[in-house]
């Protein structure tokens, strides 16, 4: 990834076809040791290709891949809202039942009235 980042920096700087030596110089300028095998592979893969076209192509491919995370969150959010309203309805009924039970506990002797 660091090799690709250096390659892209050189491209942004105006070098349309950076060499392995150019990429190595960028990496060494910030204290990173370049892996010559990976660097040679990167240079051979990108040789003769336009960086902007590669980025656009990659963006199209990423956009076509479904992420899957948003659908489940929306479904679970709706289920939680439905479950929450059912619990909210049950709570007042439970409170009414408790009040009736409390009034029965003193057996009609209102000691603290």
Swiss-Prot record:
Note the superkingdom of the native organism.
Answer: Eukaryota
Please name the InterPro entries in this protein's record.
P1/P2_N_sf (IPR038716), Ribosomal_P1/P2 (IPR027534), Ribosomal_P2 (IPR044076)
**GO BP annotations, alphabetical order:** cytoplasmic translational elongation
Give me the ranges of the annotated region Disordered: 62-113
Q: Which cysteines are joined by disulfide bonds?
A: none
Q: Which GO terms describe its molecular function?
A: structural constituent of ribosome
Keyword field contains Metal-binding: no
GO cellular component assignments: cytosolic large ribosomal subunit
Q: Where is the composition biased (Low complexity)?
A: 76-93
Q: What does this protein do?
A: Plays an important role in the elongation step of protein synthesis.
Q: What assembly does the database describe for this protein?
A: P1 and P2 exist as dimers at the large ribosomal subunit.
Name the UniProt record assigns to this protein? Large ribosomal subunit protein P2
Origin species: Alternaria alternata
Gene it is expressed from = ALTA5
């Amino acid at each position: 990834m660091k090799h690709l980042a250096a390659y892209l920096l050189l491209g942004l700087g105006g070098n349309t076809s950076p060499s392995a030596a150019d990429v190595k110089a960028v990496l060494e300028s910030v204290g990173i040791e370049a892996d010559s095998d990976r660097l040679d592979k990167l240079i051979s893969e990108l040789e003769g290709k336009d960086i902007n076209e590669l980025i656009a192509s990659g963006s199209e491919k990423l956009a076509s891949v479904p992420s899957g995370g948003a659908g489940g969150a929306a479904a679970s959010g709706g289920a939680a809202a439905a479950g929450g309203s059912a619990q909210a309805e049950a709570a007042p009924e439970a409170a009414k039942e408790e009040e009736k039970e409390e009034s029965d506990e003193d057996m009609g002797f209102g000691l603290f009235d």
